[in-house]
A protein has these predicted regions:
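Conserved core of the PLP fold type I
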Residues: 116-247, 259-276
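AMP-binding (ANL) adenylation modules
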Residues: 406-412
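N-terminal basic, amphipathic alpha-helical segments
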Residues: 1-110, 309, 313-319, 331, ...
Length: 440
């Protein structure tokens, strides 16, 4: 400490470098606190920096947290991670930036921010305008029966937790969105899977489950189910509502994809056909509008509404007023309908482009059902393949896909991949199929 370094000239001659290089090195050493420069005197070795605090010992948390981990969401959350820039994404659940109506959203947000009183605390139930819009879309609820939430995920969590108690039985489709499984297991529920096909939930098998045990809640995606793209058939809709009435269970309708139609007539919401308050309805605008617009509605009738409102107050409190105002401004404008047409057209092009590429390059991969909406193809791998292994090797080859086993509530009935076309242009989807073919 305190030793004087040789002069710049000496260092230059000793190491055969330029004076500029020596100056850069000295400046870097000084920035790190290793040397001290004293003008007119020279450069000296600095005193050893004080030792920092000892590294934190976080091992105690393992004992405090216990052995339970949210395994059900681990692989699913990995799909939300940003891959390498050169990786083609065929695994996510949102539209890509090219399909976000940015200019219209900015205009709506600008108008919303200028409104008087918008920066105050919004009502717990949501603004009147937002509740009215979602009530009209639901087809079965009054605005007073609608609660606005910060996105669809929190709405689903509130509904499942509020309508059940730990230890209760809950019926989930299989395959289905793994977020339901994670919520149910986190709440200590007893999960009973019921298979689906292209016509939605197998109500004949649901009847067997409900006859054998008391369940409180059945969770369904009647329209463009994730991941299969199936639509609940008219006869099964009637049977589901009849089973709910006879067995006294709630039905949670996750209507996440109504604004992601590619073509053809859509059935009405299940809630619109429910007379006795069995259906609890969730509708989000995040997927069709933009990932940053985290806004959804949760609707119910009777005592269930009061239970949901109390749970929402604890878990979600109130939603940003400017966000609600901006969303309603956009959804009530001609820009929204133009955007829906654009999304429908582009999703159709992407779906068909990916299907053609799969049939050309991967004839052994079977897509049994071509969805009329949503963002995903449910593709069965040939016998002998492991979906998790294929997904891992595909990622190494530069294409990110989702292993089908992530989506099964029970044992997988085969090896599948969920291939997303909503977040990737056609040319990249074709290249993604080529990369996937290289690992099969």
């Amino acid at each position: 400490v305190g030793t004087r370094l040789p002069s710049v000239r000496e260092l230059q001659q000793r190491y055969q470098v330029s004076p500029l290089t020596v100056q850069h090195v000295v400046r870097d050493l000084a920035a790190k606190g290793l040397v001290t420069v004293r003008p007119g005197s020279g450069t000296f070795v600095a005193a050893a920096p004080p030792r920092g605090p000892r590294p934190a010992d976080l091992a105690w948390q393992h004992a405090a947290l216990g052995g339970r981990t949210p395994q059900d969401m681990t692989r699913h959350l990995a799909l939300l991670e940003a891959p390498h820039p050169d990786t083609i994404r065929m695994s996510g659940g949102y539209l890509d930036d090219s399909l976000i109506p940015e200019k219209a959203l900015v205009a709506s947000m600008t108008r919303a921010m200028r409104r008087t009183g918008v920066w105050g605390r919004a009502p717990v139930e949501g603004t009147a305008a937002a509740r009215q819009w979602f009530a009209r879309q639901s087809g079965g609820f009054d605005p007073a029966e609608v609660l606005i939430t910060s996105g669809g995920q929190i709405a689903l969590s509130i509904a499942i937790r509020a309508l059940t108690r730990p230890g209760d039985a809950i019926v989930l489709e299989t395959p289905t969105y793994p977020g339901y499984t994670a919520i149910a297991r986190g709440h200590g529920l007893d999960i009973h899977p019921v298979p689906t096909d292209r016509d939605g939930l197998r109500t004949d098998l649901l009847e067997d489950v409900l006859r054998a045990r008391v369940a409180r809640l059945v969770v369904v995606q009647p329209l463009y189910a994730n991941p299969t793209g199936g639509v609940l058939a008219p006869d099964r809709r009637r049977e589901l509502l009849d089973l709910a009435r006879r067995h006294g269970v709630f039905v949670l309708e996750d209507d996440y994809a109504r604004d992601l139609s590619i073509g053809g007539a859509q059935p009405p919401t299940l809630a619109s056909q429910d007379q006795h308050g069995h259906v609890v309805y969730v509708r989000s605008i995040t997927k069709p509008v933009a990932p940053a617009v985290r806004l959804a509605a949760l609707a119910a009738r009777g005592p269930a509404l009061a239970r949901l409102r109390a749970a929402k107050t604890l878990e979600d409190f109130y939603v940003s007023g400017p966000l609600q105002e901006a969303a309603v401004d956009f959804l009530s404008s001609p820009a929204w309908q133009r955007h829906r047409r654009t999304v429908s057209r582009e999703l159709g092009l992407r779906r068909d482009g990916l299907l053609a590429a799969l049939r050309s390059r991967l004839p052994g991969v079977e897509v049994a059902h071509v969805p009329a909406g949503g963002m995903h193809l449910w593709a069965r791998l040939p016998e002998g393949y492991d979906d998790a292994d294929v997904a891992a090797r595909a990622l190494a080859a530069g294409v990110m896909v989702s292993a089908g086993s992530t989506w099964f509530t029970a044992e997988p009935e085969g090896a599948y991949l969920r291939l997303t076309y909503g977040e990737t242009p056609v040319a990249q989807l074709v290249e993604g199929a080529r990369r996937l073919a290289s690992v099969l």
